């Protein structure tokens, strides 16, 4: 699969000394990339998970910058921003409107996108600007694709999906975690997962279902089993094909305190069109973990303590690739440094 390439493979293919061929120089590559992705989605129904398209756009953006095609790279970045829910089209909007985040489902991605916009539109003559761009693109590619999942599974990735699933569901969950991330799942596979959760549910603290190809209907199929896990604290559903419709279902089920009784976070980043989290969703999570004391949100510019209970605690609640929480940012610049450190 295309996204299995290593972080250095793109650099080897598009090194500064290499003369690109005519096909790779096409100025409308980004447009054809989007058209091909849309055509595949039309033929395959739900289509590929959106991270395939987004990673391809990041890699093409880096290639354009290496070739000095900053104007085209800026246009491609605009399309990537819109694909990720950052609908603004001007640089000022990107740098200032999104300098403080409100209820974003994936603040790490948005922070990296803002940093990319700065390097593309406001390049600094001093220092290794290209090296900084390459690092940002590596971080964004890593965050938007299942590289970390493949690395965690190590030996399992060489097996077929059914063998991987069987290995993970054999015995008790290690470290109280059911980690199926990166393993493509079918509706029939979910029956086995449901049976496993019912059998071992008392031991499960975390369920990882990122990059498994889940659709809204598949999540709804799992919800009865997931919502009754007594110790579950984190549920990862990132990198799938989920839409805002399932977010409404999750918000409704969280209104019942007997469902997901101990959950503190549900990761819905890098899906089709889930870009922000409604306050009822966040408040329901907060009620389940009052000692945590923070909503996973950053105040918008101009908002203050008088803006309401739901935005009184302005910190980002997310996890880095290693699974630990990222420290809250006091302002945008500090947040950028924190995120970069977490992704290095």
Curated annotation (Swiss-Prot):
The keyword tRNA-binding does not apply. This is Leucine-rich repeat-containing protein 75A. GO terms for biological process: proteasome-mediated ubiquitin-dependent protein catabolic process. Residues 1-25, 295-344 are annotated as: Disordered. Keywords: Leucine-rich repeat, Repeat. One of its GO terms (cellular component) is Cul2-RING ubiquitin ligase complex. LRR repeats lie at residues 204-217, 229-242. GO terms for molecular function: ubiquitin-like ligase-substrate adaptor activity. SUPFAM superfamilies: RNI-like (SSF52047). Belongs to the LRRC75 family. Residues 11-21 have a biased composition (Low complexity). PANTHER family: LEUCINE RICH REPEAT CONTAINING 75A, LEUCINE-RICH REPEAT-CONTAINING PROTEIN 75A-LIKE ISOFORM X1. InterPro entries: LRR_dom_sf.
């Amino acid at each position: 699969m295309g996204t299995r390439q290593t972080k250095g493979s793109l650099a080897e293919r598009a090194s500064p000394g290499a003369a690109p061929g005519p096909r790779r120089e096409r100025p409308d590559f980004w447009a054809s990339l989007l058209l091909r992705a849309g055509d595949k989605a039309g033929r395959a129904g739900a289509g590929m998970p959106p991270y395939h398209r987004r990673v391809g756009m990041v890699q093409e953006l880096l290639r354009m910058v290496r070739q000095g095609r900053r104007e085209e790279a800026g246009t491609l970045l605009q399309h990537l921003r819109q694909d990720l829910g950052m609908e603004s089209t001007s640089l000022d909007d990107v740098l200032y409107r999104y300098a403080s985040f409100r209820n974003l489902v994936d603040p790490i991605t948005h922070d990296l996108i803002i940093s990319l916009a700065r390097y593309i539109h406001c390049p600094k003559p001093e220092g290794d600007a290209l090296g900084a761009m390459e690092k940002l693109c590596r971080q964004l590619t890593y965050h938007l694709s299942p590289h970390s999942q493949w690395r965690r599974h190590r030996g399992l990735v060489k097996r077929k999906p059914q063998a991987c699933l069987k290995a993970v569901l054999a015995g008790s969950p290690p470290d109280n975690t059911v980690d199926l991330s990166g393993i493509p799942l079918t509706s029939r596979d979910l029956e086995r997962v449901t049976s496993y959760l019912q059998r071992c549910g008392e031991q499960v603290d975390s369920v990882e279902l990122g990059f498994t190809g889940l659709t809204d209907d598949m999540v709804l199929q799992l919800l009865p089993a997931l919502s009754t896990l007594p110790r579950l604290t984190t549920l990862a559903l990132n990198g799938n094909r989920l839409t805002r419709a399932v977010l409404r279902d999750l918000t409704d089920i969280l209104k019942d305190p007997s469902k997901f009784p101990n959950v503190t976070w549900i990761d819905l980043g890098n899906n089709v069109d889930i870009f922000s989290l409604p306050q009822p969703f966040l408040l329901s999570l907060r009620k389940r973990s009052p000692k945590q004391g923070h909503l996973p949100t950053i105040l918008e510019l101009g908002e203050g303590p008088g803006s309401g209970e739901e935005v009184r605690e302005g910190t980002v609640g997310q996890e880095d690739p290693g699974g630990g929480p990222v420290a809250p940012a006091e302002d945008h610049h500090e947040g950028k440094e924190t995120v970069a450190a977490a992704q290095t």
